């Protein structure tokens, strides 16, 4: 699922492969974790996190909680969750605390300009 979604981001949404890292290590509560995909800006700032699950795994609150915990480290505006069959994207407004679910996965350019 991770490879397919990464290819989708590159081929369909114009994400630069050079700014995408898979299985990116992070420390959370003194424990080593890995996010599936992290997208960066050219400046090196993290911009989006992707959590991938197997097609047999239902996307539920626990999956969103997992990627939200990872985001405590990165504080990116965009979180993507996919099981290869369903894709979700939410945008976080850190000033208001509002979480907005988007109807589609944004292009890389729109990710940077919003």
Question: Which residue stretches match the model-derived regions?
Answer:
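A short, conserved, highly charged catalytic patch centered on acidic carboxylates
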Residues: 1-78, 85-114
């Amino acid at each position: 699922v991770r490879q397919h979604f990464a290819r989708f981001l590159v081929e369909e949404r114009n994400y630069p492969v050079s700014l995408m890292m898979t299985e990116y290590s992070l420390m959370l509560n003194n424990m080593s974790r890995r996010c599936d995909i992290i997208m960066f800006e050219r400046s090196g700032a993290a911009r989006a996190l992707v959590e991938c699950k197997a097609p047999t795994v239902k996307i539920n609150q626990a999956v969103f909680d997992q990627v939200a915990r990872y985001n405590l480290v990165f504080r990116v505006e965009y979180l993507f969750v996919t099981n290869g069959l369903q894709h979700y994207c939410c945008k976080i407004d850190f000033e208001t605390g509002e979480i907005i679910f988007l109807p589609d996965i944004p292009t890389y350019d729109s990710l940077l300009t919003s």
